[in-house]
């Protein structure tokens, strides 16, 4: 009975438990250096053994009580983050939770051979949908793996070699496996763009049953899907050093930038902007801003190298002739990052300080148009007269990240000021205080907003080293994740509404797989936040 009381006491006093564990190991060391004649004395030996057995029982039992919350039992409760005073401990818990959420999601959303991802799973009915995930949704699993790998590397830097050694290789292998099976979304087609006609192999929206055989013509591939994949390929390269990731990232980058509208207006300026896809004319925030950060990263990769690249453009004099030019990769990538950033800021930043969805109101219509120049067919510019659509959190999040990365690369104060203003405006616009839970901020969770919000968190994290206010903004995500984990974890999964919980009607608890991978990625991103709080 006394032991049970001690265990319960220790369960809610983790700091004391840690001290006892330390004392236990000190005692073990003491026993090892105890004089041999004393250790071999029968009575002394029995007395020491009794002391250590009792102490060992208390330590093991208390540690067990602290580990129990990590199971999948529905009644699971975890000690609140507020009880953990050491920021490194918070970060380790974040990473462990991320890995638990990710591993569980792989179990329920992927086929047994891990080749296919399904879209929905209901933890109450235990039913998985037959509908397979789109490539965008599938990419969320790769994003989560990369975030976990980044967290593991951060833990190693902090001295937690054991956590790194036990998990790093497994997630590196998972990254390679997920990347390999993404080929079920790959397909090839011939595209006439603003400057050329060329064959490309890119990612389709939907998965097919054979690698490399997807239909990617027209609207069946979109540029933003390639951008999310590019981002994760470069991140994978930076984390593992695997050259194949970088090679594919640059290939897809060439495809995406081939979609840039380099036709010129009456003043000789580029019309600019990348349409949603080769089958669309509207130019979306999601098909432009996500490319800014990856381009800065490519610039940084090649900054000290002399690698060259040849690109195509439209002559500024006659405004029709297609030309080509060869320059250093580092210069090319940084210049394009600036151009995309400037286009989106000029056309889509609204009077609320956040970003609209897209440039629309096509004139004369929204059909892809072509023109003939010197006997050769090229894509033609379509006028877009107005910024329209909902302001989604990710369209501001990508621009915060882009501003932070461009500031790091250029040290131009304009990017820092842009990033600070957009960070403040985004938090004010997207985070609603006390609307569900006191002292918590609610972010929209309908539609695909859970994933969108993770992109906003990434922006807060990326700018926080140079804009300290972002630290309090990102903490709102930590609070919401912890609240959902403490109150609503069910069968190892979190609900779509972290603060509101599950539907009373269990049949309505069909959860998007990409949301679970988004939660895992968010926890992992918070785990290697070097600012600690």
Predicted segments, located by residue:
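CBM-like carbohydrate-recognition segments
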Residues: 79-224, 283, 391, 414-533
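Short coil/turn linking the two alpha-helices of tandem helical-hairpin repeats
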Residues: 149, 153, 237-241, 299-306, ...
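Short hydrophobic targeting helices and cationic amphipathic motifs
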Residues: 10, 16, 25-26, 31, ...
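Active-site cradle of extracellular carbohydrate-active enzymes
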Residues: 271, 278, 286-295, 324-403
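Extended ligand-binding groove/face enriched in aromatic
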Residues: 162-318, 334-335, 372-373
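Bacterial N-terminal signal peptides that target proteins for export
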Residues: 47-59
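Boundary at the C-terminal end of the N-terminal hydrophobic targeting segment
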Residues: 73-75
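Bacterial N-terminal signal peptides
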Residues: 58-68
């Amino acid at each position: 009975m006394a032991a049970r009381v001690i265990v319960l006491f220790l369960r809610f006093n983790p700091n004391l438990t840690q001290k006892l564990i330390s004392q236990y190991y000190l005692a073990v060391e003491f026993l090892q250096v105890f004089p041999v004649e004393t250790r071999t004395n029968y009575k002394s030996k029995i007395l020491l053994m009794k002391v250590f057995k009792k102490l060992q029982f208390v330590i093991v039992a208390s540690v067990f009580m602290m580990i129990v919350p990590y199971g999948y039992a529905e009644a699971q409760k975890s000690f609140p983050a507020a009880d953990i005073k050491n920021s490194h401990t918070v970060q380790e818990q974040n990473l462990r939770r991320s890995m638990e959420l990710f591993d569980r999601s792989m179990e329920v959303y992927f086929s047994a051979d891990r080749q296919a991802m399904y879209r929905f799973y209901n933890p109450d009915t235990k039913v998985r949908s037959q509908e397979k995930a789109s490539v965008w949704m599938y990419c969320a699993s790769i994003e989560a793996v990369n975030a976990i790998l980044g967290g593991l590397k951060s833990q190693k830097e902090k001295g937690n070699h054991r956590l790194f050694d036990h998990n790093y290789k497994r997630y590196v292998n998972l990254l390679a496996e997920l990347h390999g099976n993404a080929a079920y979304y790959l397909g090839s087609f011939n595209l006439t763009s603003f400057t050329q006609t060329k064959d490309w192999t890119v990612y389709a929206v939907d998965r097919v049953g054979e690698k490399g055989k997807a239909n990617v013509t027209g609207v069946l591939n979109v540029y933003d899907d390639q951008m999310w994949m590019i981002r994760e390929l470069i991140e994978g390269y930076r984390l593992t050093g695997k050259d194949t990731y970088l090679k594919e990232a640059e290939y897809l980058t060439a495809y995406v930038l081939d979609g840039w509208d380099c036709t010129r207006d009456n003043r000789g300026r580029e019309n600019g902007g990348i349409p949603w896809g080769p089958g669309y004319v509207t130019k979306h925030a999601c098909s432009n801003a996500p490319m800014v950060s990856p381009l800065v990263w490519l610039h940084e990769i090649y900054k000290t190298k002399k690698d060259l690249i040849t690109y195509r453009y439209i002559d500024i004099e006659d405004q029709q002739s297609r030309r080509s030019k060869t320059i250093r990769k580092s210069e090319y990538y940084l210049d394009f990052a600036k151009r995309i950033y400037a286009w989106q800021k000029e056309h889509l930043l609204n009077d609320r300080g956040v970003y609209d969805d897209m440039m629309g109101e096509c004139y004369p219509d929204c059909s892809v148009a072509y023109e003939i120049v010197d006997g050769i067919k090229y894509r033609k510019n379509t006028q877009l007269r107005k910024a329209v659509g909902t302001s989604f959190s990710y369209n501001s999040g990508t621009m915060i990240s882009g501003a932070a990365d461009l500031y790091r690369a250029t040290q131009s104060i304009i990017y820092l000021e842009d990033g600070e203003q957009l960070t403040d405006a985004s938090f004010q616009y997207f985070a609603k205080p006390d609307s569900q839970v006191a002292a918590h901020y609610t972010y929209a969770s309908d539609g695909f907003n859970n994933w969108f919000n993770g992109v906003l968190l990434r922006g807060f994290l990326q700018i926080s080293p140079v804009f300290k206010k972002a630290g309090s903004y990102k903490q709102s995500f930590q609070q919401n994740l912890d609240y959902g984990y403490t109150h609503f974890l069910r069968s190892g999964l979190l609900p779509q509404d972290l603060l509101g919980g599950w539907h009373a009607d269990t049949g309505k608890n069909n959860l998007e797989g990409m949301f679970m991978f988004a939660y895992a990625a968010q926890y992992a991103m918070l785990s290697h936040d070097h600012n600690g709080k």
